[in-house]
Amino acid sequence: MSELKQKQVFKEKVMHSEEEDVSPELNTQKTFSEKETFIPVEIEEQQKETEQELQLEQVIRPKSGRKWLTTGLFATFAGLVVWQAVDSVITAIQTADWLALGWVGFITTIASFGLGALGKELWKLRKLRNHFSVQEESEALIDSQSVGKGKAFCEKVAEQSGVLAENPGFDRWKNSVNPAHSDAEILEMYDSMVVSQQDKLATKIVSQHATESAALVAVSPLAAADMLLVAWRNFKMIDNLSKVYGVELGYASRIKLLRSVFVNMAAAGASELAIDASMDLMSMDLAGKISARAGQGLGVGILTARLGLKSMALLRPLPWYPERQVKLGAIRKEVVAKVASITMKP
């Protein structure tokens, strides 16, 4: 008896019928409407979050205000002072009151110095307003698709910023520009070749003042001295940054700029805290374990760095480009290293 199995014959009709019974809908055509297409919900949410962060990081500039009202009040006050001085001189000469004439001359001299100082402050305040208008104009050129305005605009910005024609970056930018470039491309090249050099100097200034403020607060035993010291260092930092970007500041314009910086820090606080809160808390915890004064110094250093970066954003002639924007993380590392080196010394 053979151990081999007998052959089995399968019919095609049976196979087809079985296949049809198992999967009757495999060959059926099915169309999808637009409502049934796949939608990447997570990507959209990430894009919305990114847009919200960018909106928070935008620079908030002060409003122009009533320029004509301020100029009119100053002109009226100056006219009244001159009128009063001339009338007093004529009256003193007619009555032969030489003592009154001397007092009139003395008071007129003091008033002229005061008017000159006030006029100088108003002029510097006007230049600061013009600087903000230049920033707005640069943003409009970057967002537009125009051609032919970018080179003249950048040359005007270079003149206002005190960039010399012999500057290597400015000379390289002029040689790189050709008529085929759009205004946005010309401004991007100017930012990468000229403004980036100013950014490097400004970043060094911010880093230096932040680390020095943190170190001074960490070793200072007096809270009142800390407050005065930090305020003086911050004003000095803003003055140095304004010189780097060629913005001349007076007393009134310095106060206006500082107020604008605080407004920007408050507006962007939510976004920055969401990004940097963990690192700040980690740094504060590290310094707090070493000493309480080190923790205070580290907090002051980070606050000074934030103040400096917001000042840079307001003093730059062009808006930040994301790939070249100075981040707080690099400066924070230097502040932490400085405070740690001071507090860990035996």
UniProtKB/Swiss-Prot annotation:
List UniProt keywords, sorted A-Z.
Cell inner membrane, Cell membrane, Membrane, Transmembrane, Transmembrane helix
Q: Which residues cross the membrane?
A: 73-93, 98-118
Stretches with biased composition (Basic and acidic residues): 1-17
Q: Which PANTHER family is this protein grouped with?
A: UPF0283 MEMBRANE PROTEIN YCJF
Organismal lineage: Bacteria, Pseudomonadati, Pseudomonadota, Gammaproteobacteria, Vibrionales
Question: GO cellular-component terms in the record?
Answer: plasma membrane
User: Taxonomically, which superkingdom?
Assistant: Bacteria
Where in or outside the cell?
A: Cell inner membrane
Provide the membrane topology annotation.
Multi-pass membrane protein
Q: Which InterPro entries match?
A: DUF697 (IPR021147), UPF0283 (IPR006507)
- Its main localization is membrane
What family does this belong to? Belongs to the UPF0283 family.
Q: What is this protein called?
A: UPF0283 membrane protein VIBHAR_01918
Species? Vibrio campbellii (strain ATCC BAA-1116)
Q: Where is this region: Disordered?
A: 1-28
Q: Which cysteines are joined by disulfide bonds?
A: none
